[in-house]
Amino acid sequence: MNAAKRLEIFRRLHEDNPDPKTELGYTTPFELLVAVTLSAQSTDVGVNKATARLFPVANTPHAIYALGVEGLSEYIKTIGLYNSKARNVIEACRLLIERHGGEVPQSREALEALPGVGRKTANVVLNTAFRQPTMAVDTHIFRVSNRTGIAPGKTVLEVEKKLLKFVPKDYLLDAHHWLILHGRYVCQARKPRCGSCRIEDLCEFKQKTSDD
């Protein structure tokens, strides 16, 4: 795919959704960090239901740490792997308090030093909370990048690096959200909705569907 096609793709995505947002509910960087940590192998809808119960009661490192693993588990037990996630969040809260004064750090190294926080989670926090030009490649972004030809790659890291290289700079900060939403609602895994796709004419996917 050439640069002109990529530019037009992101121009259209921006035109349709000028201010894209994550579908996870949050009001602070810490709430976002917790929500993204809980979202592994879970849906945003499921996480939002849990955090809607949790955050009014505890939404700071000190408050969640005070709940303890068992206390936190009661709020998030509807989420998959909630026991291990509760342990990770509690330990992350301890480290945030001890090392960062209860604040969420704005560096990848510091974020990835927290339990339950890998490269993808760190990228989400850096991009969404702190507006850094990072690319959190999840299953949707990986699929869309390969299927459309925007940034094909065999690994998540390869796709991430290509997106950072190829996405036009004016659109880089929001590209993560556009690609996730496009993959979630249009360029779906089993049956892409090519008939209602805004970038269908620019997409390099060979097996396009005729209906939406």
Briefly describe each language-model feature range.
Residues N2-D212:
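Catalytic cores of DNA base-excision repair glycosylases
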